[in-house]
């Protein structure tokens, strides 16, 4: 089973609109073209689909993702409008990935850059894990770990301790995927005597400078995506970068 993660395309209604380092629509086009060549079995897009929160930006994203040769799923980030997303493509909270499954969490706090699950969503997560012991990936927008950039760590998942506590009773959780940070991250979290892999993904748009105290764009880094191979032995992963001719 080959899963690809795309994150943070930050599209505008105007496909020619520029970001700090390029044209987000063209960047996402290039990323999707590269992902098609990966022949994935599924794709997950971990939030911040839109920069301007326009209906047109979600329609443009959905048209691009519909060119993928496989099912695709998305979840909201802090910049997103759930209703506009759902109007273009269903929002789901769980999908089967062969012998694995993936849970998609909504960490959005309306009007705020940070994320939070809260008691209700954490209880729902525990209930989903109680009902199914298949190897499980969890995808969410906000990092549930510190990524090492002070300004980004201040706007991550606020209730990350409660999140990891909720996972502690469920050894079927093998890995967690996040967006938001616009940079590669790979680490582990000790969770009830085992280690859970945690992965961040390069954005499909601008990249952020790793380990920065304050907001800074990494103008030298290209957009990218993450590939995960899921099998009976576990999950292996790699990151690919995409050169965009603009």
Where does each model-flagged region fall?
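N-terminal active-site segment of His-dependent metallophosphoesterases
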Residues: 1-60, 130-131, 147
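Conserved beta-sheet core of the metallophosphoesterase superfamily
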Residues: 153-226
